[in-house]
Amino acid sequence: MVMNENNSIKMKWHRIVVLTVLCLFGFSLMATLAAPYKKKKRPKTDERVYLVHADELRYDQWGAVPGAQILKGKVHFTHAGSQLWCDSAYFFQVENSVEAFGHVRFKQGDTLSLTCDHADYNGAEQMMHARKNVVLKHRTQTLYTDSLDYDRMYSLAYFFEGGKLVDGKDRLVSDWGAYSTATREASFYYGVEMFSGKNHITTDTLHYDTRTQIAHVVGPSTIKSKGTIIHTTDAYTNSRTDRSQLFGRSTIVDGDKTITGDSLYHDNSNGDNNGYGNVIYVDKKNKNEMRANRLFYNEKTGYGYATDRALLLDYSQRDTLWMHADSMKIFTFNINTDSVYRKVHAFPHVRAYRQDVQAVCDSLVFNSLDSCMTMYRDPIAWNLNRQILGEEIKVYFADSTVRKAEVIEQALSVEHVDAKDHYNQVSSKRMDAYFTDGAMRRTDAIGNVMTIYYNRDEKDSVLTELNYLETDTMRMFMSADRQLERIWASKATGTMYPVTQVPPDKLRLPSFEWFDYIRPLDKNDIFEWRGKKSGSQLKKIQRREAPLQRFD
């Protein structure tokens, strides 16, 4: 009988030892899985978890939870400067851990608190697994989730079944995430959304610093704010200042206007947009775009400028116009009204190319109010085999089609008429050209008019005579196929020479120049500036100015 009792006692103790080993192994495995982010071995603390109070305590070594003290009613623990309250708990004193149930409340210092329905706390590794209706509060930040692991040793909280962080006006949600109570930085992964006032960010990866309220998005992301949409793969946005820094070829969309660049800086509070590196500004409504390596545009004032390989494209007509200058500026007047208009300034070294027209000048201004483009300082324009130049050229448009052109002071029009060096030429103080459906139909030359014009044989179009004419005013009418129909002149004097008998000094007007070596050859050639050769510049004429009145 004694031997049987001894055998029975040995078997019971053997079972207790086995169960204890299995429990310890299970807790060790849970701790390992709960902290997959730490590759190095976790240090452990010897500080014990202490039971402060419980209305009821019982211990059942042979019950459902062997090795646990079963606590009920106003349960209170302390550990390493933290406190834990709950309705009931299993206290594993040997393992230095607690499983808490009902109205779980955890507090660490004066800045961190956590509430949930159920929690496991391992005192040795200072790890808490909180489940169901979890609310973590740290300073001014609040994190909501249903599954959270809080690592006190590394001051990190992880959620992995959806969570929401609220920081003042900022609200962030995602599937997975982590929050550091030490640095107050948070990371969010998969299905990430951030709401801040009128701003809305969607991405798959976002890092957020609660101290600065700066969010860093990584990967394909969209930022929406007050009518502006940003597409980016790498950006920093500050919800406090409403500013964003965009990298990795980002795009800002503002209605029918877009800006794309390698690096963009967007200030939503004042509308400033700065771009660096292959920046492209597109105006879909007006069918034009501006490109440069350095570009600025303010969407509220409509002011912008471009430098470093600045390029303007206009595709409002059938063929695209390409224009380059060292710098370009755009000014918008009466913005957000029905009377809005813009001015574009390009300077210096302006070169433009379109298949049917090319131009060069030192500076250019386009005013959309009167649809006038003015070219200053040695302007030259080419159309097919015709060249026109003067001190200043103004071109007026109607629905993106040339309506009128004015050449002011030292006007010269030259047309190359055959394979040999024969040119139709007109020089005057001023020249006006009128267009119909984009084709020049009439030209008026005014003041000190001199002209050389070749007649052709109607049968074989061979040049037959040269007409030299001097007058004060002359009007030329052109056919739709650019042929001269008739000429009107007042008090003209002139001479007609057979082509074979033209004196050498009558082949060219005194102001004749043919600037084919300056003419842009294609859209890529506009970036190479070529000035006039020495001796071919326009004459410098002193203009008399009326003296200012003085009042003594």
Task: Enumerate the predicted regions with their spans.
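N-terminal amphipathic/hydrophobic interface segments
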Residues: 32-552
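Bacterial Sec-dependent N-terminal signal peptides
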Residues: 1-40, 552
